Amino acid sequence: MFGKGGIGNLMKQAQQMQEKMQQMQEEVANLEVTGESGAGLVKITINGAHNCRRVEIDPSLMEDDKEMLEDLIAAAFNDAARRIAETQKEKMAAVSSGMQLPPGFKMPF
């Protein structure tokens, strides 16, 4: 099934992938992404662990109704979370792109 040295090569690839994944997870944890809503009137910056680092609200929104502001804040946070998820998915794909996996083997992402 694996041929000569195939299992050894597969184990080596798995170890390399594990190291790359750990490095990628550290990179994503340190990454900061800003999500926006209301055409940039509300901005929320979160890190890769989804911890909020900064909230910016345009002063013009302070005069509007509270409910709209709350909706814009939630939308900005969701935008930032989506951007983190996309970045994480791209980095995971880059980690696994060079591996020669056995037929039918699928990565968990």
From Swiss-Prot:
It holds the Pfam family YbaB_DNA_bd. Gene3D superfamilies: Nucleoid-associated protein YbaB-like domain (3.30.1310.10). InterPro entries: YbaB-like_sf, YbaB/EbfC. Its main location: cytoplasm. The keyword Cytoplasm applies. Signal peptide: none annotated. GO terms for molecular function: DNA binding. SUPFAM superfamilies: YbaB-like. GO terms for cellular component: bacterial nucleoid; cytosol. It is found in: Cytoplasm, Nucleoid. Transmembrane segments: none annotated. Binds to DNA and alters its conformation. May be involved in regulation of gene expression, nucleoid organization and DNA protection. Homodimer. PANTHER family: NUCLEOID-ASSOCIATED PROTEIN YBAB (PTHR33449:SF1). Belongs to the YbaB/EbfC family. HAMAP family: DNA_YbaB_EbfC. This is Nucleoid-associated protein PC1_1077.
